[in-house]
């Protein structure tokens, strides 16, 4: 069984997120999502989530592509989750990341002998665009 892991805040879940989950699921049998409580605490340039962790968790658990959800607060949690998953699934683990992460050398995933698949972003769906549309329609 191939297990995939992808993480993010998934605030205001939109079509772009769903397309990414669908792409991830095409490459694995079981998809685990890491749900970040507040990405602003790890990267100050990130926006604080609009939705609560409960709202985001509840919405994600209803997605047919997602099999399991881990909640995390910081980079150390992601490292611990990755270590746990690698210990459990070994080379059957795939780490999914947005293609925007290509070329970065500070990723914990690079320290583990696992596959990394960069998901494509061949669309214009984003949280920022959704917020702009909501602001303009109100």
Q: Positions of the model-derived regions?
A:
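Nucleotidyltransferase catalytic core that binds NTPs
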Residues: 1-138
């Amino acid at each position: 069984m191939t297990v995939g892991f992808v993480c993010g805040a998934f605030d205001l879940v939109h079509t772009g997120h769903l397309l990414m989950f669908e792409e991830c699921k095409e490459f694995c049998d079981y998809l685990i999502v890491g749900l970040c409580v507040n990405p602003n605490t790890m990267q100050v340039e990130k926006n604080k989530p609009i939705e609560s962790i409960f709202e985001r968790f509840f919405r994600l658990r209803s997605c047919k592509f997602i099999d399991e959800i881990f909640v995390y607060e910081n980079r150390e949690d992601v490292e611990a989750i990755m270590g746990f998953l690698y210990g459990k699934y070994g080379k059957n683990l795939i780490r999914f990341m947005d293609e925007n992460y290509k070329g970065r050398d500070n990723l914990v995933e690079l320290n583990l002998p696992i596959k990394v698949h960069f998901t494509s972003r061949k669309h214009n769906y984003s949280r920022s665009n959704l917020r702009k549309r909501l602001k303009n329609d109100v």
